[in-house]
Amino acid sequence: MEQSSNRPEDFPLNVFSVTPYTPSTADIQVSDDDKAGATLLFSGIFLGLVGITFTVMGWIKYQGVSHFEWTQLLGPILLSVGVTFILISVCKFKMLSCQLCTDNEERVLDSDQTSGGQSFVFTGINQPITFHGATVVQYIPPPYGSQEPLGMNTTYLQPMMNPCGLVPSSGAVAATPSPPQYYTIYPQDNAAFVESEGFSPFVGAGHDRPSSDADQLEGTQMGEEERVCFSPPPYEEIYALPR
C-alpha cells in the first residue's frame, strides 16, 4: 500500500498578473456638483433666450403698442441673469470644457491608477489569493535533505556524574540511539587507571624519610579509598544493553 506524501511539488503554484481595470467616464457616477452645474447651465440658457425675446419684442413693438413697455426692462434683466448662470456653471462646475483640458485630466487619472500597482493572483491552492498593488517576493524553500529531524540531536549528551563516578538515582540516563564507546566516557589518562598517581605521594615520602608502620598503614588505606572512589563503574551499569 503506497503512502502518499503531500509535498509542495504535488501542488503547482501559478502566479499571473492582472492589469487593474480603469473605469471610463460613463462608469463614474454623477455627483451632486454635476447635477447642480447642469441645472444652472440649462436655467441660464432658458433665461437668456427669454430675455432676448423680451428685449426684441419691447424694442420692435414699442412704437405701435404701449403694452410692451415692460419688456424693455424685463428682457435685459432676464438676459443678464441667464448669462450669469451660464458663467457660474462653466467656471465653477466646469460643465463646458475644452477637449485639451479633458485629455489632460484623463491622463492624470490614468497615471494615478497605474501607480497603485498591478494585481497578482495566486492559484493552485485551496482558495485563490489576490494582492492589489503589493510587492511580491519569491520564496524558495530549502531542500528536504538538509532538514534535520525534530527529535533528539545526534550529538551525545553525557550524563552528570558524581566524583565517585556513580550515576545519580534521581535522574534518568538519556536514551540515545546508540551508546557511546567506553573510552569516550573514561579515557585512559584518568587518575583511576594510573596506579601510581593515587598513592605516589605516600610512596615517595616513605623513601625520603623514615616513617612508622602506622603511617604506612594509614597511607595504604587512603590510597585504596581513593582508588575505589575514582574507579569507573561497570559498563553494564551505565548503559544496559537491550535484550
UniProtKB/Swiss-Prot annotation:
A Pfam family: TMEM174
GO cellular component, one term: apical plasma membrane
TM ranges: 40-60, 73-93
Region (Disordered): 205-229
Cellular localisation: Endoplasmic reticulum membrane; Apical cell membrane
GO-annotated biological processes: phosphate ion homeostasis
Entry keywords, A to Z: Cell membrane, Endoplasmic reticulum, Membrane, Transmembrane, Transmembrane helix
Membrane-topology annotation of the record: Multi-pass membrane protein
Assembly description: Interacts with SLC34A1; regulates SLC34A1 internalization by PTH and FGF23.
Known role: Regulator of plasma phosphate homeostasis. Decreases serum inorganic phosphate (Pi) uptake by regulating the sodium-phosphate cotransporter SLC34A1 trafficking by PTH and FGF23 in the kidney.
UniProt xrefs under PANTHER family: TRANSMEMBRANE PROTEIN 174
The protein, known as: Transmembrane protein 174
Organism: Rattus norvegicus (Rat)
